[in-house]
Amino acid sequence: MRIEQLKKVTAPSAQEICVLATAGGFKLTAREGASPAEFLNELIAAKSLNEAVQFFAFALPAREAVWWACQCSRGELSDPIPQPLQDAVEAAETWVRKPTEEHRRAAMSRAQATDFKSPAAWAAAAAFWSGGSLAPENLPEVPAPAHLMGCAVAGAVMLAAVKSEPQLADQKRERYLASAIDIANGGNGRLASAGS
């Protein structure tokens, strides 16, 4: 997998994205002058797939990042899907399609109805943390820190890779990265089945 371009990633340098990821507690260090695509290619070539996932979580714009978390989360939901998890991922997808304040807050409500041990919960939390206020409505605004959404997206995707069949985590990460690359270039990021 070689990345030539990332149309939707607007940061001119990988270092800029690494600063945001570092604020979220991740240890990503890009070489000076590396573009986001160059840095991702370096991570993938070094088989640093977890770090590549983390980098993408902070590199993608908010809606695209949450959509990616939803795609990876859906891939790990198995029948019968517990209703709170279904509700959480659907709330996050609704926010992606129509990013209103009402949908953003509904996503967090659905995330809180889970045990926060699933990728779906973190995808929904990412939608809430994408912007706006963290405070309850009608209280003074408490802006979400810029790194919070990326942390939730990274958590959703990394958890999706190991939640079931952890021995296949690297193969899942490769699929998830292919999805992120597609999203970053204007695609829908739908995951190919594991066998394809």
Task: Show where each model-derived region lies.
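Short, glycine-biased loop/turn motifs at secondary-structure junctions and
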Residues: 1-117, 132-196
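Alpha-helical transmembrane segments of helical membrane proteins, especially in multi-pass transport
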Residues: 122-130
